[in-house]
């Protein structure tokens, strides 16, 4: 018993030493500890800079500056005081570190910001934050972040759409197997498949244009949205601030802008991420070994597909983007929850929104770029596509032949039954459907052997695939 207790004590002491060592290690590393993969693995600097600590700080400074500018226009603040505030409202003067230092005392981020600004402005600091509430600053700064994010999204989406247009045009007439329910259906072209993506992403750009004015809206009517603290010129003050910042002016708010605006933008990002995953999921499925019709670019000289299976060429960029798309979509639920604020507002939304808005935008930007990378270098094996059609033993042309029989006088139900019976025979025996149909009295009395062979050519049953590609690409190119 004593030995057993001694063993337990030794184990406890060892675990205790490990914990202490880990805590000391973290203390030494300080702010260099990184946990989120956004810090070191995912996302571009262009997107991260908008939602970084510094990006948020810089925009909040600009909102505070715009407030004093508006007061100056209305004669409440002198031009000299405004000039001084504008001079110090820069992140290299009023630093984020100084604001954080003050916040450790005040436990209020915007009050810390105003104190740091007043400290730097000297005698002109009397007017800083005049008539404002914290969320006048916060929500207007977030609107600036959203505006800058949307500008970036417009650019990246247009580039992706252009890449899709190029691919659709290049593969306009590349015949391949259409599949429904995971089964062979009828022939299509790879260009048509991509044209569907083209039209979908063009609609995403249209939606972004439509929602932008609603989501780049700030506010400046104070603690409960009455404008009482702003005085008799409250509306004019708010309008001046929004005009100076390049934001939309709201009609009515509480202490915060309506979170329906954020929901709309996050939902749009989730929608786009779904479209990207759908396109890249198609690439991944068509790259399956048993299909092998397309392939993500693989650097055969250097790239490794597996640490043990040396032959592997995996669609890792597409897989990576598909995984991140799921994170973007997951931000929808907390975005809806953030709209459920008590009365004129509470603070339950604040911490969640530091994740939902930034992570959605940064990850969506990342997967748009990755999708563009995959599609711009996508390998398309047209010979394999024809091979896969031929492997269906003519079954994919059953619809074509059925329609031809109807056009030559056979009732539609009768034609369907003739082809259904012949198709089941082909499936059960492994014989080519064309050969079975050639022996059918119902078919051979209508078509010669050559006419029947012509009906089994995949390129004869593409409908208006090419014209659809042309139209989708034309409309999209006009849009971008």
Predicted regions and their residues:
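Long, amphipathic alpha-helical stalk/connector segments used for oligomerization, subunit docking
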Residues: 327-408
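Aromatic (phenylalanine/tyrosine) cluster motif
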Residues: 6, 12-14
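A conserved active-site cap/scaffold subdomain adjacent to cofactor or substrate pockets
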Residues: 261-293, 303-360
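A helix-coil-helix interface module used to build multimeric assemblies
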Residues: 28-221, 227-228, 235-240, 249, ...
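C-terminal alpha-helical interaction appendages
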Residues: 377-442, 470
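Glycine-rich cofactor-pocket loops
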Residues: 169-191, 293-312, 343-352, 376-396
């Amino acid at each position: 018993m004593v030995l057993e207790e001694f063993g337990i004590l030794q184990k406890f002491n060892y675990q205790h030493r490990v914990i202490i060592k880990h805590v000391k290690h973290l203390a030494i590393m300080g702010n260099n500890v990184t946990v989120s993969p956004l810090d070191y693995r995912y996302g571009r600097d262009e997107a991260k800079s908008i939602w970084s600590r510094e990006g948020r700080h810089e925009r909040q400074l600009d909102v505070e500056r715009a407030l004093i500018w508006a007061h100056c226009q209305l004669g409440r603040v002198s031009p000299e005081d405004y000039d001084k505030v504008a001079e110090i409202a820069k992140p290299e003067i009023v630093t984020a570190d100084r604001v954080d230092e003050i916040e450790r005392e005040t436990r209020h981020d915007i009050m810390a910001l105003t104190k740091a600004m007043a400290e730097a402005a000297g005698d002109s600091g009397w007017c800083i934050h005049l008539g404002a509430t914290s969320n006048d600053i916060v929500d207007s700064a977030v609107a600036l972040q959203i505006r800058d994010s949307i500008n970036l999204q417009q650019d990246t989406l247009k580039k992706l759409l252009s890449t899709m247009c190029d691919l659709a045009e290049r593969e306009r007439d590349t015949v391949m197997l259409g599949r429904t329910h995971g089964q062979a259906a009828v022939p299509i072209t790879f260009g048509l498949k991509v044209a569907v993506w083209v039209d979908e992403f063009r609609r995403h750009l249209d939606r972004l244009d439509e929602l932008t004015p609603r989501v780049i809206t700030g506010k400046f009517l104070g603690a409960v949205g009455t404008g009482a603290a702003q005085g008799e010129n409250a509306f004019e003050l708010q309008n001046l601030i929004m005009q100076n910042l390049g934001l939309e002016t709201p009609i009515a708010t509480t202490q915060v802008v309506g979170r329906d605006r954020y929901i709309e933008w996050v939902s749009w990002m989730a929608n786009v991420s779904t479209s990207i995953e759908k396109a890249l999921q198609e690439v991944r499925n068509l790259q399956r070994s048993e299909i092998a019709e397309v392939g993500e670019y693989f650097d055969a000289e250097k790239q490794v597909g597996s640490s043990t299976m040396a032959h592997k060429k995996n669609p890792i960029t597409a897989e990576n983007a598909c995984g991140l798309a799921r994170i973007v979509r997951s931000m929808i639920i907390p975005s809806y929850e953030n709209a459920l604020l008590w009365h004129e507002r509470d603070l339950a939304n604040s911490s969640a929104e530091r994740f939902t808005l930034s992570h959605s935008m940064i990850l969506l930007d990342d997967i748009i770029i990755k999708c563009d990378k995959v599609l711009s270098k996508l390998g398309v094996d047209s010979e394999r596509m024809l091979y896969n059609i031929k492997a269906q033993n003519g079954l994919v042309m059953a619809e074509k032949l059925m329609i031809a029989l109807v056009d030559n006088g056979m009732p539609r139900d009768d034609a369907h039954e003739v082809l259904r019976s012949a198709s089941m025979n082909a499936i059960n025996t492994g014989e080519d459907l064309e050969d079975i149909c050639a022996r059918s009295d119902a078919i051979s009395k209508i078509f010669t052997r050559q006419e029947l062979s012509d009906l089994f050519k995949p390129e004869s049953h593409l409908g208006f695939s090419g014209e659809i590609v042309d139209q989708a690409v034309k409309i999209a190119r006009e849009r971008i």
